[in-house]
Amino acid sequence: MKLTWNEVSNEMKRMEKAESTKLNPNKTIVIRLDMRSGGSFVRGLNKPFDDSFSEAMEKTAKELAKQVQGAQLVYFGSDEITILLFKNKVKKEFTPFFEGKLQKTVSLTAAIATAEFNKAWLEIINRTEDSEYKEILKSKLFYARFDSRAFNIEGGINEALASLWWRMKDVSRNSVQMLGRKYFSQKQVQNLKTYEVANKLDEIGHKWDDEVRTVNKYGNLFIREAYLGEGYNPKTKETVKVTRHDWFGTPEEQMKEFLSVRELEDLQKTKIFERLDFKE
């Protein structure tokens, strides 16, 4: 190959294109983000759960919901976030984030999550009054990093919801274990199943279901939903009712119902599914 700008440029673009992967817009797309070394980041924060960390994660999830084109559902729990992208009933054609280009999808979502978390963390620091706690928060500023992966779900919406069920179940199990480690030694809870830890907590008057906030038990799930709002008609100069869309969180009873499902096809019978603007 002759070293001219055009020759090298064309060759590099050819190789880049050969290695580029596109996600299939006709199948549900799952994007999963994790905080890199999340366990190290939370070291020194309040145990077993830190409200500042939960708040920053929630704000990060909401920003991803707003910025990732095609997202219909965003879930966060602990230090991870799951985004589902699929066809909705409004648009005839579904155009996913960056047209489904895999490398751009994972690099941009990781960058958005990293930037938004650190932005939220700084806001929390600025309003924190406890000087000792504030110094702990400051020591972690700009150290949050997220990685991202994206893939197509084989199957249909049930399989996509199953991936969500799996992550939510994992978060709730870990939550019980974390509360257990607050009141018992590692030796006392070692090798115990989740329900056994919950029973031990009940025996000493610390019921997981009552003592832990919803966001620390299950995380939170944001769904893009239509609602009737107000708009202005410039022709008639009147206020009119218009359909708008926004992101809404999920009450605890809906997440409990979702986690209680034991058969794949029954996921479509849940309130969470009813809220989705899903199109086959």
Q: What name fits each language-model region?
A:
Residues M1-E280:
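Regulatory and interdomain segments flanking nucleotide-handling catalytic cores
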